[in-house]
Amino acid sequence: MKRVDIKIGFNCNNKCKFCVQGNKREHYQNKSINEIKEALYKAKQNELTGVVFTGGEPCIHPNIIEAVRYAKELGFEYIQIQSNGRMFAYYDFCQKLILAGANEFSPALHSSQEQIHDFLTSNKGAFQQVVQGIKNLKKLNQYILTNTVITSRNYQDLPALAELFIDLSVDQFQFAFVHILGTAAENQDWLVPKKSEIMPFVKRGLDIGINAGKRVMTEAIPYCFMEGYEDYIAEKIMPETQVVDAEGVIESYSDYRWKLGKEKRKECENCRYFNICEGPWKEYLEIYGWEEFKIIK
């Protein structure tokens, strides 16, 4: 599958302390429905088969239903809504999205503990809305793949969060290490944990999902931390993605990660995973350096 990721606007009803988009909401207006349709049409002409509506928070864009409907009319097979999940708490809104053509939903839940999730999203009540949203979508028989951003404040809770995902019957969950850009960069002194410290909790969380028969993934955690869990590295199966952003179009997000976003050192050439490992985000190395990373023979 090849897909297009369209950031339809940067307005948001949360203000996450790890947000990679930072203050873009203050500088960029929503894309108009015509701009969204143009991006969808071009993507379809280029034979892309999937679309992810994201942002910002796509569910508060005034034309989200029309945009989804147009994607369906064009014949996109996979129409995903990547969201903080709060609007999914409204059952009728979920119904409208599904009727328009959405068939994958990716809400974000960052802790099994209400106070931690609400703290990280800067929004009291957000946890309850996301949980209700997942319940609504399951009642409507939708495919749910959640995303959790790993930070210093929630990594110890990952096993309990995995248990909650099982209880909520999500289809897939992913643990993604924080990308230190935007608001995350502003908070990096207290927000960013060492990868070596999080791994026991990440692996316990993965085990819980694996044992329950769920699809589980990690993102932005290199192979040298994932011994025995190499099959659960998201980058190895990520579809080729075009990103339509405020500043322009990234034709290949994979190329961006490999050539600009992430980094490997000379010693990595001796690792068995050198040709398939992307390495860590560059910003992580500026904080902690290479000491934790090792060569896998």
Language-model regions, residue ranges each:
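Residues that line or immediately flank small-molecule/substrate-binding pockets and catalytic motifs
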Residues: 23, 55, 83, 109, ...
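Cysteine-centered iron-sulfur cluster-binding motifs in ferredoxin-type domains/subunits
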Residues: 8-15, 57, 264-268, 274
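Canonical Radical SAM [4Fe-4S] cluster-binding loop centered on the CxxxCxxC motif
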Residues: 2-35
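A short acidic, helix-capping loop that chelates divalent metal ions and anchors anionic groups
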Residues: 25-27, 114-120, 182-188
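Flexible mid-to-C-terminal extensions adjoining Fe-S/redox cofactors in radical SAM and related proteins
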Residues: 230-297
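Short glycine/serine/threonine-enriched helix-capping/active-site loop
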Residues: 1-4, 107, 175, 218-219
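Radical SAM/AdoMet-radical enzyme domain recognition
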Residues: 33-52, 61-177
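Radical SAM enzyme [4Fe-4S]-AdoMet core and its adjacent flexible, acidic
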Residues: 123-128, 132-135, 139-256
